[in-house]
Swiss-Prot record:
This is Phosphoenolpyruvate carboxykinase (ATP). ATP binds at residues 185, 204, 220-228, 269, 305, 431. Belongs to the phosphoenolpyruvate carboxykinase (ATP) family. Keywords: ATP-binding, Cytoplasm, Decarboxylase, Gluconeogenesis, Lyase, Manganese, Metal-binding, Nucleotide-binding. InterPro entries: PEP_carboxykinase_ATP, PEP_carboxykinase_C, PEP_carboxykinase_N, PEPCK_ATP_CS. It holds the Pfam family PEPCK_ATP.
């Protein structure tokens, strides 16, 4: 930071930040006590504006391309100094936080923000430690200045806004954007780069634990059900989005949740509903004339959000971590209506589907996405956040599955009986019944039937689920049309997978066109 900053609020409380945000006109107080803020034109992540500084220490280990775009060190330093100078005479908010609920693998991070509500977001989503940085590790710095306007020709950015990660300097710079999710995803990308070198698998997943200490992981892209399904009244939540899987443990990388709010209902998502109260930040949620949030209103964006600390969840795992997972669930939202609601995977199939990351962009978190739903392949169920080559993460996944003996399942939260627009989407109670059968261990030894084209093993019965739903061909009125769509999907899988250099055992574990 630049010298001479005045009016610094250091480690401010929730009440202080809410009060300051309201006083400064950054947001409104809602009827349920939450603070609602609007993010302007950017209502999602801006992947085209995200860069990693290209420097000797990390250059060889990063997969450079459209996701990880290089930025020159000298250009970064110049821009960092310009943003620091911009903040030097402003009221700013600073907190000492941590990323990673593990004494060995945490990162200390000092977060400086121009907005009070951004600081509240950071304190909700990162971990507020009892004693900051007990191991005395080098501290990371996040500097977030949404009011700063970048000049692409001068600064080397792609637009007026940017997100830049610098591993050598341990710095993250955010300038020109109000969407707060960029802060959490930046530090997730940092841990995604650092953890594999320590033999820890970083994961874009949610996690919960049962009364008997059995951990379950839920992988999936935004909108596939990670947050909803892990917020289970019968289990204890570890976290809803980012975790590390180390030998002996699964730990949360964060200290809070960032839940999608579109169509949120008390009936279907009681845990999330109850977590939205004083201290929660609502992003781009529209209020009615009595300031009651209208969760059905997508006039600002489909990507409406609630950011709250884990303390807002009654049934949570206090220490923010658990044992290794007995069950691992890959959530896919299949818009073609071809995939079964649940399949059991071998470890090779798990690696195949992990690398494929087949799903749909549902109410996408990325800028420029509309409500239209389209299928996508997102490596490791989170391609935008993984700096290393995909094979690094797939190998670590197979190693952890093999060493611990986890059972992996592919669960379709998308369509059946026809593609999007024709068939119907699996309802949340059906998916919950499937997940209940998975976490109870009932599906581990159940009889299965083989689906040839998809190369998947499907249970013949699942408690609480209509048997007719289990084999997808039975839900289509036109069986020939189903085979046609299944063939098309198998071909898409194969075309996407051709880019991976992996053993034949993994290559052959996917659909057969």
């Amino acid at each position: 930071m630049a010298e001479g900053i005045n009016r610094v609020h250091r480690n401010p409380s929730t009440a202080e930040l809410v009060e300051l945000a309201l006083r400064r006109g950054e947001g409104e107080l809602t009827a349920n006590g939450a603070l609602v803020a609007k993010t302007g034109a950017r209502t999602g992540r801006s992947p085209n504006d995200r860069f990693i500084v290209k420097e000797a220490g990390s250059e060889a280990d990063i997969e450079w391309g459209n996701v990880n775009k290089p930025f020159a060190p000298e250009a970064f330093n110049a821009l960092w100094d310009r943003v620091a100078a911009y903040l030097a005479d402003k009221e700013v908010f600073v907190s000492d936080l941590e990323v990673g609920a593990d004494p060995e693998h945490y990162l200390p991070v000092t977060v400086t923000t121009e907005y009070a509500w951004h600081q509240l977001f950071a304190r909700n989503l990162f971990i507020i430690p009892e004693h900051f940085n007990q191991a005395g590790k080098p501290t990371w710095q996040i500097m977030n200045a949404p009011g700063f306007v970048c000049e692409p020709e001068r600064d080397g950015t792609a637009s007026e806004a940017t997100v830049i990660i610098n591993f050598a300097e341990r710095k993250v710079l955010l300038a020109g954007l109000k969407y707060a999710g960029e802060m959490k995803k930046s530090m997730f990308s940092v841990q995604n780069f650092l953890l594999p070198a320590k033999g820890v698998l970083p994961m874009h997943c949610s996690a919960n634990v049962g009364k008997d200490g059995d951990t379950t992981l839920f992988f999936g892209l935004s909108g596939t059900g990670k947050t909803t399904l892990s917020a289970d009244p019968k289990r204890f939540l570890i976290g809803d989005d980012e975790h590390g899987w180390a030998p002996g443990s699964v730990f949360n990388i964060e200290g809070g949740c960032y839940a999608k709010c579109i169509d949120l209902s008390q009936k279907n998502e009681p845990v999330i509903w109850d977590a939205i109260r004083f201290g929660t930040v609502l992003e781009n949620v529209v209020l009615d004339d009595k300031r009651v949030p209208d969760y059905k209103n997508a006039s600002l964006t489909e990507n409406t959000r609630a950011a709250y600390p884990l303390e807002h969840i009654a049934q949570r795992q206090e220490e923010n971590r658990g044992g290794e997972p007995r069950a691992v669930v890959f959530l896919t939202c299949d818009v073609s209506g071809v995939l079964p609601p649940v399949s059991k995977l071998t470890k090779e199939q798990a690696a195949y589907h992990f690398l494929s990351g087949y799903t749909a962009k549902v109410g996408s978190t990325e800028m420029g996405s509309t409500a239209a739903i389209q299928s996508t392949f997102s490596t490791c169920f989170g391609a935008p956040f993984f700096p290393r080559p995909a094979g690094v993460y797939a190998e670590l996944l197979m190693k952890r599955i093999e060493e611990f003996g986890s059972q992996v399942y592919l669960v379709n939260t998308g369509w059946t009986g026809g593609p999007y627009g024709v068939g119907k989407r699996f309802d949340i109670p059906t998916t919950r019944a499937i997940v209940d059968a998975i976490v109870s261990g009932e599906l581990a030894s159940v009889e299965t039937v083989h689906l040839e084209k998809l190369n998947l093993e499907v249970p013949v019965a699942v408690p609480g689920v209509e048997t007719a739903l289990l084999n997808p061909v039975n839900t289509w009125a036109d069986k020939a049309k189903y085979q046609e769509y299944a063939q098309k999907l198998a071909e898409e899988f194969q075309a996407n997978f051709a880019k991976y250099q992996v053993p034949d055992s993994i290559k052959n574990a996917g659909p057969k066109a």
